[in-house]
Each structure stands twice: as C-alpha cells, then as structure tokens.
Amino acid sequence: MAIRHFRRQREQVTSGSSSDTETSDVSEQDTGAGEGPTEAETRAEGAEQGAWERAPSVAGSEAGESDEDDSESSSSDDEEVVLHRPVFLKKRDPGAGPAARTGAVSGAQERTLDQVQHHNAVQDKERALKQIATSYSTDKELLHRIAQLETDGDTDSDSERREHELWAQRRHQRMLRLREEERRRQSELEENEAARLTNSALPMDDAGIQTAGGAERGTRPASSSDARKRRGPEAKFKPSKVQKPQLKRTASPSRADENEFSIL
C-alpha cells in the first residue's frame, strides 16, 4: 500500500516537471529569440530542481514507512486470530402490542397455578399415605394386644377359676328359680281355667243360684217356674244378682307377677 502511494507521488512529480518544460518551451517560442531567460523561467527551473532534490528524500522516507508497515502486517499475520461468538438479536414483532403482553402474563399465571395445584396434590397424597401407614400400625398393635389378652386369659389363677365357678352356680340357681316360678304360675292358671269351666257347666235356678244336684232342683217352688214360663223370652235378658261364691271361683288371679319386674 505504501509502495503504491510512493509510485503515484513520483508520477505526479514527473508529470509536473514535464508540464513545466512544455510551458517553458512555449514561452520561448512566443518570445522569439530573446536575450536571456526571464524571472518566471528561472523560478520554474529552481522549483524543478528542488523537486528533484526532495524526491529522493521523500522516496526514502516512504520506503522506510512501507518497510515498517510490511513488518507490522507480517507480525499481525503471525498472531492468532481471535473470533468472537456472534450474538443473534431477536427480531421484534411489530404486531405484538398490549394484547400480546397480556396473553403472555396470563399464560405465566396459568403455569404458576398448575404448578401450585400439582404441589398441593402431591402433599395431599403424601398425607393420605402417612395416615394409612399410621392406622395400619395402630391396627397391628391393637391385634397384638388382643392376642396378648387372649393368651393371658388361658393362664388364669386359682382365685379367678373359683370365682368363675361360683358365678356359674349362681346362674344355674337363678335359672332353676325362674323355671319353678314359671311352672307355679302356669299351674295356677290351669286351675283357675278348670274352675271357670266347671262353674259355667252347672245349671242355674230362677234366683240365679247354681245347683250341684237334683235335690236342690226338687225343692224349687212351682211359682217361680210358672212365673218364668209366663215371662217368656224376655226372661233370659234379665240381669241376675251376682253371688259371692260364684265371683270368687270365676275371678282370675292377679297377673302382676307375669311382668319383667316380678322376677326381681
């Protein structure tokens, strides 16, 4: 690059000198055969000579600069080239406005809500499993205690056996007493029923007194029989006086002892 600059500058200097010589020739031709060079010509010649004198120094300086540039370029080429990682920028959507931002916010809220629900469901399941494990261990412990009690019951002491025997005897006596009471009550009911049937089978006279034999029927006055015949069918609807022996035989016994409090 420095070499090109130097060549371009040298061509400019040579072109400038050639143009000066041409102008000088033209001026000489115009003036004709003058006595000597004019002041302008002398100045042009001095400038040309100064340019030729400065050209080697400029060329040397430019050559030195070109050498330095070549050395720097060669040293830079020798160094390792560092390539940076490219950064890609997202292209903004011009149509994304407040509605898009609102949708993004709502989507984030829904995702957060789903995560919370999932976390709560996991906690509920763990709690249920813990309760099941606790109840299972409690049931096992309860069954173990029951089995231990049954095992302890097989090895009763002598006092406990004696107490159980006494309780069994009391229960047997109580059952016998209740059975005897039931038998006695049943026999009384049967006797009362038999007496009632016997009293209902005996004939009644006109006065309403039951007679046991024919002797009593023979001593009955005739006037009463005649009066009964005269009364006709209305006589059977006439109420009669209740006698004490009849009431005593037909009355049923008290049933207060048949309830659940009679055994106590």
Curated annotation (Swiss-Prot):
Keywords: mRNA processing, mRNA splicing, Nucleus, Ribonucleoprotein, RNA-binding, Spliceosome. It comes from the Eukaryota. Disulfide bonds: none annotated. One of its GO terms (molecular function) is RNA binding. Residues 178-188 have a biased composition (Basic and acidic residues). Residues 64-80 have a biased composition (Acidic residues). One of its GO terms (biological process) is mRNA processing. Coiled coil: none annotated. GO terms for cellular component: spliceosomal complex. It is found in: Nucleus. Residues 1-109, 178-264 are annotated as: Disordered. The keyword Ribonucleoprotein applies. Component of the spliceosome and rRNA processing machinery. In association with the spliceosomal U4/U6.U5 tri-snRNP particle, required for splicing of pre-mRNA. Belongs to the SPP381 family. Component of the 25S U4/U6.U5 tri-snRNP particle, a subcomplex of the spliceosome. This is Pre-mRNA-splicing factor SPP381. The lineage of its organism: Eukaryota, Fungi, Dikarya, Ascomycota, Saccharomycotina. The gene is SPP381.
